Amino acid sequence: MNVRRVESISAQLEEASSTGGFLYAQNNTKRSIKERLMKLLPCSAAKTSSPAIQNSVEDELEMATVRHRPEALELLEAQSKFTKKELQILYRGFKNECPSGVVNEETFKEIYSQFFPQGDSTTYAHFLFNAFDTDHNGAVSFEDFIKGLSILLRGTVQEKLNWAFNLYDINKDGYITKEEMLDIMKAIYDMMGKCTYPVLKEDAPRQHVETFFQKMDKNKDGVVTIDEFIESCQKDENIMRSMQLFENVI
């Protein structure tokens, strides 16, 4: 395969994977990213235009009889980078999609597949679900969702890269191995589907993994640490640019 083409595809994949896959689109603009997020939470596009509606949403948070009772708005506001009003809007959309107050993995996969109808996002959504499910109980609560979204949208570069590393580190042992990276890359290629037209060779994911490790495995010990990952990403203009696209999309 042409070396320049591999490098170009690698850059696209790094942008997509380093930000949870939300960024990959034909036109990676703040508007297109916002549209994707609103598609995930359709009711979040509705404005809480009056105090009565705002109070209604707040009452839902405090008095809900759903299976999972979310934390108080004030606590979530302190733990995230969203305002109280933004949390009210996001909760309305979340509860509309997930009346029980939590999202299981199958529902998460169904929702996420809307982002990538041209491919198969099932495996990548599994990895992404595990990144949001921080307490590993098999469900993503509103709190889990908000904390992850807060990092992706408004976190510092360091926070976003830590989140991305955790996504790659499948077994959570503090290292990214070639096997883990290959699993992630295969999932991303499947997810992107027609976006990789013309169709790439079967060994393309493995080639991307080799490129990734040549760039990031500084001491050549066969694994990538969090420090190596962050240092390499901070020197990559494409990845840094993709991080900025997330700012203020809500």
Curated annotation (Swiss-Prot):
GO terms for cellular component: cytosol; peroxisome; plasma membrane; voltage-gated potassium channel complex. One of its GO terms (biological process) is protein localization to plasma membrane. Ca(2+) 2 binds at residues 169, 171, 173, 175, 180. Pfam families: EF-hand_7, EF-hand_8. Expressed in brain. Highly expressed by neurons in layers II-IV of cortex and in hippocampus, thalamus and the Purkinje cell layer of the cerebellum. Gene3D superfamilies: EF-hand. Residues 2-44 are annotated as: KIS. Residues 61-117, 120-155, 156-191, 204-239 form the EF-hand domain. Ca(2+) 1 binds at residues 133, 135, 137, 144. Residues 237-250 are annotated as: Interaction with KCND2. Ca(2+) 3 binds at residues 217, 219, 221, 228. It is found in: Cell membrane; Cytoplasm; Peroxisome. It is a peripheral membrane protein. The modification Phosphoserine is found at residues 17, 56. Keywords: Calcium, Cell membrane, Cytoplasm, Ion channel, Ion transport, Membrane, Metal-binding, Peroxisome, Phosphoprotein, Potassium, Potassium channel, Potassium transport, Repeat, Transport, Voltage-gated channel. Component of heteromultimeric potassium channels. Identified in potassium channel complexes containing KCND1, KCND2, KCND3, KCNIP1, KCNIP2, KCNIP3, KCNIP4, DPP6 and DPP10. Interacts with the C-terminus of PSEN2 and probably PSEN1. Interacts with KCND2 and KCND3. Regulatory subunit of Kv4/D (Shal)-type voltage-gated rapidly inactivating A-type potassium channels, such as KCND2/Kv4.2 and KCND3/Kv4.3. Modulates channel expression at the cell membrane, gating characteristics, inactivation kinetics and rate of recovery from inactivation in a calcium-dependent and isoform-specific manner. This is Kv channel-interacting protein 4. It comes from Mus musculus. The lineage of its organism: Eukaryota, Metazoa, Chordata, Craniata, Vertebrata. The gene is Kcnip4.
